[in-house]
Amino acid sequence: MAIASNVVEAGNAVRAEKGRKYFYFRKMIGDYIDTSIRIVATVFLADLLLRLYRCVVEYGSNGRYYLPEDRLWIILRRSCTYNNRSIYLIVGFLLVAFFRISVTGNYRNVMPTTLFLFQMPLYWIWSFTDMDQSTLSYSHWIRDSHGLDYAAGMASNYFHGYLKLSLPERKDDGLKHRLAMYEDKNNVTFGIKRLVILIPDEMFVNGVLESHLLDKAEPLETQFINRAGVYRPFKHDVYRMNKKVNGRTYYFAVEGATPMISFFDATYSNLSGTWQMQELKREIWIKFYKHLKELITTWPETRDLVELIIYNSHDSKGNLVDVGELLVAHMQNKTKTIDEISN
């Protein structure tokens, strides 16, 4: 009997010890969750106060950037707008906080104490010093789809101010019509029945394309289009391939992307160049191509009129890529894609 009693007592002791460990484990997890909620609540409150402070500074110092009748509303809306990820985070922690209150019955466990609130200046110091910002942050900002970056702006201006005006058919003056008229008049054939736009990674294209395979020919018929009260000429150069492909001589309407040339000039100019432009020029090059391609393919009037060719200006051996060979390769569907070039 004594032995049996000892066994029972030992079993009870083991169960009691396991119960204590389980209790302390649950308490540790609960305390961790409560502390996390307090930290998030403190950060949110500090961020809200910082946003309100910035509203006051913006209203007092930069009011000229807003119309008087809606200045306050726009400043508040811009300052107090949260992105989707922040909203999801706040809602998630609110749900966890309500769950903890329902379990413990004590809302004080998830409310920030005075000790937590006194830590808010640390968040303000962190924000004012922009400790989370780096050059990589600029890269991610350029890649986002907001239309405010340099690359998207150049692509949009190029598309709306040039391609969308000069290429679609209006009164028998569109690109397709002019290509057909050129072929009939000169008894030639275009290798690519679109306007070919070159986008090299150097962002520079000579005024006359240099290639031992290309000879400059007569340009397409010039268009004159009224733009802001001025009849502006729109021209497209034509080049003849002096090497026969499949027994035929082909012509190409081809030109460089002029916004990229302007960006090249701006980057290397002492007046406008910055180290950020130098550092992120490849990001801008790729974003320009992607955004321009999206605009061209989305707009019904231009999706079949432009052929973008993005390429590295030098091959793996450091030799300059020949534009004529590039056109032949593209015509034969061997041009590298943007993903291959990026890698």
Curated annotation (Swiss-Prot):
Induction: Expression is directly activated by Rel (Relish). It is found in: Endoplasmic reticulum membrane. The keyword Transit peptide does not apply. 3',2'-cGAMP binds at N157, R232, K235, E255, T258, S262. Keywords: Antiviral defense, Endoplasmic reticulum, Glycoprotein, Immunity, Innate immunity, Membrane, Nucleotide-binding, Transmembrane, Transmembrane helix. Gene3D superfamilies: Stimulator of interferon genes protein. One of its GO terms (molecular function) is cyclic-di-GMP binding. GO terms for cellular component: autophagosome; endoplasmic reticulum membrane. Glycans are attached at N84, N187, N270, N333. It is a multi-pass membrane protein. GO terms for biological process: antibacterial innate immune response; antiviral innate immune response; autophagosome assembly; cellular response to virus; cGAS/STING signaling pathway; defense response to bacterium; defense response to virus; innate immune response. The chain crosses the membrane at residues 87-107, 109-129, 195-215. It comes from the Eukaryota. InterPro entries: STING, STING_C, STING_C_sf, STING_LBD, STING_TM. It holds the Pfam family STING_TM. Belongs to the STING family. Facilitator of innate immune signaling that binds cyclic dinucleotides produced in response to infection by bacteria and/or viruses, and promotes the activation of the NF-kappa-B transcription factor Rel (Relish). Recognizes and binds cyclic di-GMP (c-di-GMP), a cyclic dinucleotide messenger produced by bacteria such as L.monocytogenes, leading to activation of the peptidoglycan recognition protein (IMD) signaling pathway and activation of Rel (Relish). This is Stimulator of interferon genes protein homolog. It comes from Drosophila melanogaster (Fruit fly).
